[in-house]
Amino acid sequence: MKIAIAGASGRMGRMLIEAVLNDADAQLVGALDRAGSPFLGQDAGAFLGKDTGVKLTDDLDAVFAQAEYLIDFTRPEGTMAHIEAALRHDVKLVIGTTGFTAEQKADLQAAAARIGIVFAANMSVGVNVTLKLLEFAAQHFSHGYDIEIIEAHHRHKVDAPSGTALMMGEAVAGALGRSLDDCAVYGRHGVTGERDPSSIGFAAVRGGDIVGDHTVLFAGIGERIEITHKSSSRVSYAQGALRAVRFLSARGAGLFDMQDVLGLR
C-alpha cells in the first residue's frame, strides 16, 4: 500500500507517519505540508530519528503521482485541494478532517463518484462502537430523558462542537426518528426558558492537551445514564486510518465511513 500523509508536520500527521512506517504492508511515499512550513525539505521520519528518504513538500502533484492512498487529517480548505489532486491522479482518500461546510461536503460526495473515499470525523474503533451503543440507548430512553452531549478537546482545536460530537448527535437523533438540524441546541446563555424535551444539547470545552473526551448524557427523573468515550492518544485514530486504507484496497469508487470499514452497518 503506497501511502502519502497530509499535514505531515502536525501532531496527527506524525502519528500517521509512525503508524505507516511500523506497518509491514504499508510504504510511505509522500508527506505533504502547507506552503511556507518551516519543516519543508525535512525527512518525514526526522522526528523519530529515522531516515525515510521521503521529504516534506507542498508539491501536491509530485506526491499524488507516487501514491495510491492519501490519509488527510488537516483543515477543510486543504482537504478540498487534496480532493482535486486525488481526482487528477486517481488516488483513494481517507479523510478525518472536520469542520466542512455543507457545500464542501457536497463536493466531497461528488468526488466519491470517481474515487474511493472513507470519510469519518473519528476513526477509532471505540468511538464507532460507541455510536452503535448510543443508537440502542436512544431507542430505550426516548421518553422522559433529556439528552445532552458534552465534549472536550485541546486548546488548539478550531471547530466546535467536534465532528465526533456531531456524529454522536446524528446517531441519537436518527435512532429517535429526528433530524439533528431541527433539534440541536448549541450552547446556552442568558434566560433560555425551559428545556425543549425534544432537543439535543451540545456543550464544548477547550483547554490544555485533551485529545478528545465525549459524553452523551441521558438525564431522567431519579436517574441519569452517561455513555463516555475518552481518547488518551491519537494512536487509535492512526490505526483506524490504516484499517480504512485496507478497506479501500478492495473497493472501487464510493463514499464510505468507519461503520462500513468495521462492518457495523
From Swiss-Prot:
It catalyses: (S)-2,3,4,5-tetrahydrodipicolinate + NAD(+) + H2O = (2S,4S)-4-hydroxy-2,3,4,5-tetrahydrodipicolinate + NADH + H(+); (S)-2,3,4,5-tetrahydrodipicolinate + NADP(+) + H2O = (2S,4S)-4-hydroxy-2,3,4,5-tetrahydrodipicolinate + NADPH + H(+). Pathway: Amino-acid biosynthesis; L-lysine biosynthesis via DAP pathway; (S)-tetrahydrodipicolinate from L-aspartate: step 4/4. NADP(+) binds at R34. One of its GO terms (molecular function) is oxidoreductase activity, acting on CH or CH2 groups, NAD or NADP as acceptor. It is an enzyme of class 1 (oxidoreductase). Its main location: cytoplasm. It holds the Pfam family DapB_N. GO terms for cellular component: cytosol. Disulfide bonds: none annotated. NAD(+) binds at G7, A8, S9, G10, R11, M12, D33, G96, T97, T98, A120, A121, N122, M123. PROSITE patterns: DAPB. (S)-2,3,4,5-tetrahydrodipicolinate binds at H154, G163, T164. Keywords: Amino-acid biosynthesis, Cytoplasm, Diaminopimelate biosynthesis, Lysine biosynthesis, NAD, NADP, Oxidoreductase. It comes from the Bacteria. It is found in: Cytoplasm. GO terms for biological process: diaminopimelate biosynthetic process; lysine biosynthetic process via diaminopimelate. Belongs to the DapB family. Catalyzes the conversion of 4-hydroxy-tetrahydrodipicolinate (HTPA) to tetrahydrodipicolinate. This is 4-hydroxy-tetrahydrodipicolinate reductase. The gene is dapB.
